[in-house]
Amino acid sequence: MSNVHLISHPLVQHKLTLMRRKNASTSTFRTLLAELSNLMAYEVTRDMPLQDIEVETPLETTTGKIIDGKKLVLVSILRAGNGFLDGFLNVVPGARVGHIGLYRDPETLSPVEYYFKMPQEMQERDIVIVDPMLATGNSAIAAVDRLKQLKPRSIKFVCLLTCPEGVAALQKAHPDVDIYTAAIDRQLNEHGYILPGLGDAGDRIFGTK
């Protein structure tokens, strides 16, 4: 699992544990997700390319390094993926944002696309897909399949939780996609939910059932 990055920072693990609690309110869950995604963004963007730039300090001119945030595209898998956006945009405010709508057929667990909106000129951009859960892997695979048609330079997948089944599925379909997660949980249940997990992330973010 060389392309799986488990983010084990104490603050990440602390906030994830608080999110797992079934009695965490919607506002608490949402706030923790924003804080956690902010922390995860540092790890996910660790290898972003830099370019040299001349900077005039109060004392002299020097060469500094900056990132080109406009080369980064955050792609939210609706609707739960939107909970990641604020945290990442706090770190890279120049990033572009795209959305892909996928819902899971309750019978087959297969993804069905209902929305797709991306920035222009996706070629040579670096894409970071955000979705709280990598469960069966079906939605992640469908999203990567669709985005690869746009010929980006790279694609990463970021989630709060995953499980061995989800990791194996995404790695088999797209071995070139790095996976970033705060936890690899035990297994899926018969309904395609991660155990022990934290429930339905979308419902917990938006207060729906």
From Swiss-Prot:
Which residues of the sequence carry a binding annotation for uracil? Answer: 194, 199-201
UniProt keyword Magnesium present: yes
Q: In which pathway does it act?
A: Pyrimidine metabolism; UMP biosynthesis via salvage pathway; UMP from uracil: step 1/1
The molecular function terms in GO held by this entry are: GTP binding; magnesium ion binding; uracil phosphoribosyltransferase activity
SUPFAM superfamilies in UniProt: PRTase-like
The UniProt gene name for this protein comes to upp
Query: Looking at the record's lineage, which domain of life comes first?
Result: Bacteria
Q: Which GO terms describe its biological process?
A: UMP salvage; uracil salvage
HAMAP family, alphabetized: Upp_B
Q: What is this protein called?
A: Uracil phosphoribosyltransferase
Q: Which UniProt keywords apply?
A: Allosteric enzyme, Glycosyltransferase, GTP-binding, Magnesium, Nucleotide-binding, Transferase
Protein's job: Catalyzes the conversion of uracil and 5-phospho-alpha-D-ribose 1-diphosphate (PRPP) to UMP and diphosphate.
* Cofactor notes: Binds 1 Mg(2+) ion per subunit. The magnesium is bound as Mg-PRPP.
Q: What CDD domains does its record include?
A: PRTases_typeI (cd06223)
- EC code(s) of this entry: 2.4.2.9
Catalysed reactions, semicolon-separated: UMP + diphosphate = 5-phospho-alpha-D-ribose 1-diphosphate + uracil
Q: Where does 5-phospho-alpha-D-ribose 1-diphosphate bind?
A: 79, 104, 131-139, 200
Spell out the family assignment given in the record's similarity comment. Answer: Belongs to the UPRTase family.
Q: Name what cofactor the protein needs.
A: Mg(2+)
